[in-house]
């Protein structure tokens, strides 16, 4: 299909450095033309931070670009190739319904991938139609923006455009295209792909590109590829700890969904935990709980081991020595993760300094929450506000004992109680994207064309650490249900 190149002053300043890699890494592909694009959502704060032109983006020409009907003159649309371990099984993948337009360079020199998701078939579609449904695209928009507001590294959503098409899933659904913004779309699965089907020279090209893109200081190191591995391990240790601290369950931690940049990607079957339970699973296809909340750190370590395996030819010419180097690096993950998690949990309890018994204090609270079915977010919200009469734990012997120990712990630090409360307020969100509130917003938007519910939800989620009466509606738990909440891989 011939590309419809245009010059439209959207503010996009595109380069195409990924296209300079060997062609094994991508296939050039034009977006499919869609019949009737309409703008559903536009992310004005993100537009401002990227210094794009909102007025042009919401014009007919701008919407055509967001829909893939027109292509910016500097763009080189391409589908990226990658592989991945899905639920532990290795398979060939690739962008089956997404196209990278290029990399937007901000006036400050920052580089961001601009990707259209749901833009049509590619050579990696594996029999799929390359399309996306409106509901899952709006869901990714909501959750990714909530994650960003929570301070968790994430891909962002610039816009959602409806296509005017009906796509066939279990039923007919309205089609949509999401414009995703990311530090990059390089994945552990990208390295697995070239490790399996490429040459060592092509592997080195990807590693060098990744260093240049994300870890430039690595060039000066004695072993740049070891530095690359170590930095990715650090970033993932920080990321997974942040997930755990807010009760986020990704749901599909396949290696193709682990970014080298350390951003959260793919919001298909994700959800936030209500009642605290380490075995929490939302994904309808995760029947054995591989990606349960409590197992996410272990899965991250497993994924990183797969990444390390791909780098073995670059780490040392001696295979045995390369394995030792990789194993030593991977062994650091558990300690790095635990340090990040403990630091975050101390902050959630208003604790500034370290004591050896802190971990026991934290684990005891979590155990009590699990025993009595206490809501994860609201328990910390209640401890922060001081209204402990609002928690189901009040009056439980274990909690009353724990609460006394916690108060004693706070007295053993120099910082004031006011300082502790301020630390807790900045560490414990008052509002998260509760599953029932997200579904409420999606139903209004998709079925009724009413985006006001979603707009109000997004406004609340943009201020997660604001403790106000306006947030109360979004902090309420769902009504008891006989059916556990389930998510699906729609995105």
Swiss-Prot record:
Active site per the UniProt annotation: 256 (proton acceptor)
Residues given in the record as Mg(2+) binding sites: 257, 266
Family matches, as Pfam families: SelO (PF02696)
EC number: 2.7.7.-, 2.7.7.108
Cofactor(s) for this UniProt protein: Mg(2+); Mn(2+)
Catalytic activity: L-seryl-[protein] + ATP = 3-O-(5'-adenylyl)-L-seryl-[protein] + diphosphate; L-threonyl-[protein] + ATP = 3-O-(5'-adenylyl)-L-threonyl-[protein] + diphosphate; L-tyrosyl-[protein] + ATP = O-(5'-adenylyl)-L-tyrosyl-[protein] + diphosphate; L-histidyl-[protein] + UTP = N(tele)-(5'-uridylyl)-L-histidyl-[protein] + diphosphate
Enzyme class: transferase
Keywords for the protein's UniProt record, in alphabetical order: ATP-binding, Magnesium, Manganese, Metal-binding, Nucleotide-binding, Nucleotidyltransferase, Transferase
Positions bound to ATP: 94, 96-97, 117, 129-130, 180, 187, 266
GO MF terms, alphabetically ordered: AMPylase activity; ATP binding; magnesium ion binding
Known function: Nucleotidyltransferase involved in the post-translational modification of proteins. It can catalyze the addition of adenosine monophosphate (AMP) or uridine monophosphate (UMP) to a protein, resulting in modifications known as AMPylation and UMPylation.
Family label: Belongs to the SELO family.
NCBIfam families: PRK00029.1
The protein's name in its UniProt record: Protein nucleotidyltransferase YdiU
Native organism taxonomy: Bacteria, Bacillati, Bacillota, Clostridia, Eubacteriales
